[in-house]
Amino acid sequence: MASITQGKNESTLLKKVWDIANVLAAAGVGFTDYITQLTYILFLKMDSEKEELGLGSAIHEGYKWEDLVELNGTDLVDKYEEILKELSKDTGLIGTIFTKASNKIDRPVMLAKVIEMVNGENWYMMDGDFKGAIYESILEKNGQDKKSGAGQYFTPRALIKAIVDVVDPKITETVADPA
């Protein structure tokens, strides 16, 4: 299967990711929460795209991307919170990803704007290197903006926990983050 960027170059999509960050910043969402909320929203969107390709869905009916995109106002916020709560109860990988998930975008107009912006792209079929470039850009911008670690990248604790839960290393094994 060929990867796509829907005719858009990397800088255009990186700009879109930062436009989303600006929307969330205007809603009072901090950088760490931005990363978390963007991850949840992109996961829901990519699961939907995967299902459209006939590859199945990891998410139960009633808690999918499609259940969000048609809503607005407090109904949208309520549904997003319901989805996060329900997915956190899953006993598999989904539950690990959404452990203690909570909504940090409490303004309906801001949540609707983020969903609209994410919905305008096909994220699932993007090349893995491209997705990595987006992640690196986010980390780099955080290092510049917060002067956190002078540009060094730190793996968030929630990500470390999720990796350990999924890999399930034995007491004598090591999991490395070579970056």
Enumerate the predicted regions with their spans.
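Conserved class I S-adenosyl-L-methionine
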Residues: K170-A179
